[in-house]
Amino acid sequence: MFAIIETGGKQIIVKAGDTIFIEKIEGKEGDKVSFDKVLAINDKIGTPYLENAAVLAAIEKQGKAKKIVVYRHNAKSTHKRKLGHRQPYTRVKILEIKEAK
């Protein structure tokens, strides 16, 4: 059984037991979270979401991704700017997919 959920402005295909990386959500490690924006479960498709359907997950880790370097340079001048950015993420383990009866 698989489901398509929406979180952090992205759509993700998940199955029970999967570990996924998503945009940061509030909570501590070990907390349980529920994703209510379920777009589809197997062959059932919502308009846009399925009612009374949820995906239950547990937060495994809060962290930051690898640093990316942002470098800006203006031609014909000596202006340069170098920045780094680390995007926060949350690693969650999918526990259960609850389907509406």
Swiss-Prot record:
Keywords, sorted A to Z: Ribonucleoprotein, Ribosomal protein, RNA-binding, rRNA-binding
A GO term from the CC aspect: cytoplasm
GO molecular function, one term: rRNA binding
BP term (GO), one: translation
Domain of life: Bacteria
Assembly behavior: Part of the 50S ribosomal subunit. Contacts protein L20.
UniProt family annotation: Belongs to the bacterial ribosomal protein bL21 family.
Task of the protein: This protein binds to 23S rRNA in the presence of protein L20.
Protein name, as recorded: Large ribosomal subunit protein bL21
Source organism per UniProt: Metamycoplasma arthritidis (strain 158L3-1)
Primary gene name: rplU
